[in-house]
Amino acid sequence: MIRVKVSPKQILFRPPVEAYSLLIAVTGGCSWNKCKFCGMYKGRDYEVYQEYEILPIEYVFKQIDRAATLGYHGFPVYLAGGNPTSAPTEHLIKIIKYVREKLDNVKRVSCYSKSLDILRKSDEELKKIKDAGLDIVYMGLESGSNTVLRIMHKGTNANSFIKAGKKVIQAGIKLSLYVLLGLGGKKYSKEHVIETARVLTEINPTIFRFRSLGVGPDIPLWYDLEKGDFELIDPVDYLIEERDIIANLGDNVTSQVFNDHAANYCYIESDNIKKDKDSFLKTLNSYIGDPRFLTMKRKIPR
């Protein structure tokens, strides 16, 4: 697969929920960029398509000034890049304050973050970032299993993620986590489910969102699939994993839950999973019992 190397100043990715947000590039690429399952900024041989860079503050300010001139007021603002929280705290604070100063009635300010970026910042720094106007942070938990995280080169572990998640919430910033169904493959599916539910219970994030693993020939995990070292779960198993994660959550978990991605096999949402747990599970069980899912096979691109 041919992909063109792009400048860090070119915005490529944002969460689906930020589809109608104003995108402001703060960083380019990803400071880690080693996860096997991810092809956002690299290819299957780890060739980099977009270098990691903290963009100059003057460049960021110009984007904000341009947006103000064009009348982009009253929008959510998404600070784009693989992990803008890797930027120095004062750099990030200046950007957030400038957004709030130049754009009227900003609905929210949000960004991606890595858990390690959060752990490198003090509680005081995170509180200052919150006070400057950052409302929500998106973080890829992917799995609570240390085995799965290690195999996938995630560069962190469950305990570190729990600490990072709690730091974000303690600072008053909303935390939205991503859970990647199927990431353990067939071999580690049960461990992936149990440990992910455990970590979600420990953190009790504001929101968590399910995603379904997709593997194509342009990501490193493709090699494991070809060699037989990784086996994709069947379509119905994505629903089973989701059901079992929900079923194993502790009674303290009051998170909002979303399936807001086109790659998912169903769309269910809850504004409080503690309140909606029984109905959520009932709906998933109805899908799991559907004969169409039981006979469906995952198509793998060649």
Can you annotate each of these PLM segments?
Residues 9-59:
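Canonical Radical SAM [4Fe-4S] cluster-binding loop centered on the CxxxCxxC motif
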Residues 22-24, 75-77, 109-111, 137-139, ...:
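Hydrophobic faces of well-ordered beta-strands that scaffold small-molecule active sites
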Residues 46-47, 146-151, 220, 266-268:
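A short acidic, helix-capping loop that chelates divalent metal ions and anchors anionic groups
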Residues 38, 116, 140, 144-148, ...:
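Conserved strand-turn element in the central/C-terminal portion of the radical SAM core barrel
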Residues 1-18, 201-302:
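Auxiliary Fe-S-binding modules of radical SAM enzymes
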Residues 30, 38, 79, 111, ...:
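Conserved, mostly hydrophobic/aromatic
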Residues 66-170:
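Conserved SAM/AdoMet-binding glycine-rich loop
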Residues 124-125, 185-202:
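Catalytic cores of alpha/beta
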